[in-house]
Amino acid sequence: MTALIEEIRQKISDEQFEFSKHAVDKSIVRKILVREIREAILNGKIIEDYPDDKYGASCLISGLTQDERPIHVHCSYPARPLLKIITSYEPTLQRWNDDFTQRISTNNE
């Protein structure tokens, strides 16, 4: 997955990305800035891979902003001309381990 994250980072560095409507709506509600999404991707790592997702191959990236805010970014694979940011959110310790890279199983899931 090293090559995959490098390709994603290159798309971000080259400004070759776009946001889904869902990503725009949720980032406003969650008060996540475009800058923070960029920082999380550029500093992050792929923690979940969805190669067979029904809307196209995608992955979940966990990273920190310059202010040390943890952010998860769900994005498409970089095969398309513009990388699609599907959604972003700030993970919580109720659902993730202390470095926000592994889900915690709950009885509800």
Regions found by a protein language model. Name each.
Residues 1-109:
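Ribonuclease/tRNase effector modules and their secretory precursors
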